[in-house]
């Protein structure tokens, strides 16, 4: 079954584990299965209509999000019927194409990592991007399916896979920022959109908005659940509230990791501890913290495959003080807040006052 986003775990998980721990065994063990999957994706262009016999006319897609066309809440249907909206079918095919591009990029990277020729997948990634621009995105950065222009997740995926550039990208970013503002600086994303939300915003110069979302307390937000007693990550943004009690009782898990992906952003961006994709296993570390006074301080330690990495920052008056440790045998590219140039640090402990 080709459930977009879920089926892609067969490619995304091996790539992620390899990058995190530096061991190619998981890539080698799964290469044949990943290659077969990608051949099927390529043959069908991951198109929902083409794959309808496998999937039925349904996708989980951006599950339990608040946007139009969401499947669980039946926004993908013509109101009062079981007829799937053509806009929803088009949306599913667009998201699938974005995963096709993402998967192909990861496959090329993994091929190179295990000594294989990456050209097949480099070419496939280029074809997927060309397909996205031909079928789904106008030259000005708007979506051909007009309802997607009112949503957050479609723009996030276009930015994630670098399908838009130049003025088209700038226009999409401006529209995305306006969308957040129109929703009171609240996210509207579900499982898939949230998985790339914070990192994509930061990579595209919108870390300020990422922090707005992190500190948001209205529904939907991470702190809404915390304010309502959560000690775990919930499946739904509004799974419970003190005012209304338990939300929808069907399929309402209170221990469901999907939205826990924000922790990756906290470690990589707030704390500034990220693996360099070019050197798996934290042998080279990207340390680029993005502080915010509302957070107050960060004290983080990560026992990586390369050793213990530390990052702790705090404010003292007008000064920002950062202490960090690069483990023995590793190196780090360090970029200070507000700067673009990085500096190479060898193993050791350091303090910077800015």
Task: Give, region by region, the residue ranges found by the protein language model.
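Carbohydrate-binding/catalytic loop surfaces
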Residues: 1-5, 51-93, 140-161, 192, ...
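Well-ordered alpha-helical scaffold segments within catalytic/enzyme domains
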Residues: 10-26, 98-116, 156-167, 196-205, ...
